[in-house]
Amino acid sequence: MTKGILGRKIGMTQVFAENGDLIPVTVIEATPNVVLQKKTIEKDGYEAIQLGFEDISEKRANKPQIGHAAKANTAPKRFIREIRGANIDEYEVGQEVKVDIFAEGDIVDVTGISKGKGFQGAIKRHGQSRGPMAHGSRYHRRPGSMGAIAPNRVFKSKELPGRMGGQRVTIQNLKIVKVDPERNLLLIKGNVPGPRKGLVIVKSAVKAKAK
């Protein structure tokens, strides 16, 4: 069954494996999450657990948020997300979910909001090739042809300049290198989406290969 937790991306560092290999890892701080609600097929049409992460003061929360958190005997939360596919019988409302639900060697999917890059050209945004940079060339970094004359329009899939980044991105099949329950840290091999301090969701991998 699926396991999941919410956390914040702290940054990247390096650790050594037992065989001496240097492994680049991303550090994720996941302070204890609280189960705010259990979604059931009978009542909601699907099964999921609703997790709350990071307390906020009641002054910054509205009455529905305060009341919803009170049912779980906890403070209002800054972030609330659902984890589908979890075995809801293993969870109770008000229960804390900590990093020790994962173990070293587990394969996970990490979801976050990618870094916003603003308005970018086709070369940076789509990886297109640039034109000749010589003095005689009049074509350097433009998108190129918009298409043939006949359709009298630009096709929908044409790669053009525009807003880049700031989108929900999931990187699959990342390996957990280390779990530190005392400091609420997960060390995950490779990079994960988003800026430092950005919210990330760590879940059991959907497409993990069987051992």
Swiss-Prot record:
Region listing for Disordered, in residue ranges: 122-147
Q: Name one GO biological process term.
A: translation
State any GO CC term.
cytosolic large ribosomal subunit
Q: A single GO molecular function, which one?
A: rRNA binding
Record's keyword terms, sorted? Ribonucleoprotein, Ribosomal protein, RNA-binding, rRNA-binding
Name of a matching Pfam family = Ribosomal_L3
- Which InterPro entries does the record associate with it? Ribosomal_uL3 (IPR000597), Ribosomal_uL3_bac/org-type (IPR019927), Ribosomal_uL3_CS (IPR019926), Transl_B-barrel_sf (IPR009000)
Under HAMAP family, the record lists: Ribosomal_uL3_B
Q: Partners and quaternary state? A: Part of the 50S ribosomal subunit. Forms a cluster with proteins L14 and L19.
Role according to the record? One of the primary rRNA binding proteins, it binds directly near the 3'-end of the 23S rRNA, where it nucleates assembly of the 50S subunit.
Q: Which PANTHER family match?
A: 50S RIBOSOMAL PROTEIN L3 (PTHR11229), LARGE RIBOSOMAL SUBUNIT PROTEIN UL3C (PTHR11229:SF16)
The family classification in the record reads: Belongs to the universal ribosomal protein uL3 family.
Query: What is the name of the protein in this document?
Result: Large ribosomal subunit protein uL3
